[in-house]
Amino acid sequence: MHYPEPITKLMDSFMKLPGIGPKSAARLAFYVLDMKEDDVLDFAKALVDAKRNLSFCSVCGHITDKDPCYICSDTSRDRSVLCVVQESKDVIAMEKMRDFHGLYHVLHGTISPMDGIGPEDINIPDLLKRLQDDTIEEVILATNPNVEGEATAMYISRLLRPSGIKVTRIAHGLPVGGDLEYADEVTLSKAMEGRREV
């Protein structure tokens, strides 16, 4: 299908986003064309403002509009516990839980030798510098339960073993409301491993 050049450029821009193929890009492009001009300008401004005004916290690596971020600046948080996550969106998910009151460290990825990503390519060197502060007593490894997440957690765990800092891994298992019959073997295995006394 031949589209006018402005639509093609808009579709190409949308296809740079994850999960957006040609059909979704066309649908989004035509939706934008149907929007009021003020709404389109507000949308474009929001994109530019987000890109210009957001950066990563110099302490934890979380996305922020001020440095240090609101979490690192909060003096009421437990500074003896550090939760290591892959991405800023993981911090947001953990904060929604409202159960964790410690600090975070965002890795911005995982170790993935197949993709040429090693420990020095993610935020591990800054983690090690941060742990030189004697106030941190426990590091919780909260990377995703996939091959890369597990490899990253194992690597960090081995690095920290000589330090004497307690290193824990979040349990993985069945979601609340999930049925055993629909769970895969890895999920069931992790659920059994992560069991606790009641």
From Swiss-Prot:
Keyword field contains Transport: no
One GO molecular-function entry: zinc ion binding
Domain Toprim stretches: 80-175
UniProt entry tagged with the keyword RNA-binding: no
One matching Pfam family: RecR_C
CDD domains hit by this protein: TOPRIM_recR
PROSITE patterns with a match to the protein in the record: RECR, TOPRIM
InterPro entries reported in the protein's UniProt record: DNA_Rcmb_RecR (IPR000093), Rcmb_RecR (IPR023627), Rcmb_RecR_Znf (IPR015967), TOPRIM_dom (IPR006171), TOPRIM_RecR (IPR034137)
General function of this protein: May play a role in DNA repair. It seems to be involved in an RecBC-independent recombinational process of DNA repair. It may act with RecF and RecO.
Family, as annotated: Belongs to the RecR family.
Protein name: Recombination protein RecR
